[in-house]
From Swiss-Prot:
This is one of the proteins that bind and probably mediate the attachment of the 5S RNA into the large ribosomal subunit, where it forms part of the central protuberance. The lineage of its organism: Bacteria, Pseudomonadati, Pseudomonadota, Gammaproteobacteria, Enterobacterales. This is Large ribosomal subunit protein uL18. Belongs to the universal ribosomal protein uL18 family. The gene is rplR. InterPro entries: Ribosomal_uL18_bac-type, Ribosomal_uL18_bac/euk. GO terms for biological process: translation. Signal peptide: none annotated. Part of the 50S ribosomal subunit; part of the 5S rRNA/L5/L18/L25 subcomplex. Contacts the 5S and 23S rRNAs. It comes from Serratia proteamaculans (strain 568). GO terms for cellular component: cytosolic large ribosomal subunit.
Length: 117
């Protein structure tokens, strides 16, 4: 089993559990250059809120889009948008990525901005 298939296997297990709970989920995906986050409805078919380092509103204050500072900016922007839509409680779906570095920075910034998970 290679690295990518192991990550996908871990992500599938977590998503199955979150779906059983019927919770709104905050999904994170990272690449070497960017990080993406979405809040997805409990039925899994609708994206309620999204933020990423591809957006000018997020990256205009950043020097580079692939570091922890960028991830924290995405987490803060996502939390603010979610709270505007009345979403305050989510389940964190790290998509099989290790809870460390950029994924952790995004989660911490979202918590500080008011999301509960």
């Amino acid at each position: 089993m290679d690295k990518k298939s192991a990550r996908i296997r871990r992500a599938t297990r977590a998503r199955r559990k979150i779906k059983e709970l019927g919770a709104t989920r905050l999904v994170v995906h990272r690449t070497p250059r960017h990080i993406y986050a979405q809040v997805i409805a409990p039925n899994g078919s609708e994206v309620l809120v999204a933020a990423s380092t591809l957006e000018k509103a997020v990256t205009e204050q950043l020097k580079y889009s692939g570091n922890k500072d960028a991830a924290a900016a995405v987490g803060k922007a996502l939390a603010e948008r979610a709270l505007e839509k009345g979403i305050s409680k989510v389940s964190f779906d790290r998509s099989g990525f290790q809870y460390h570095g950029r994924v952790q920075a995004l989660a911490d910034a979202a918590r500080e901005a008011g999301l509960q998970f």
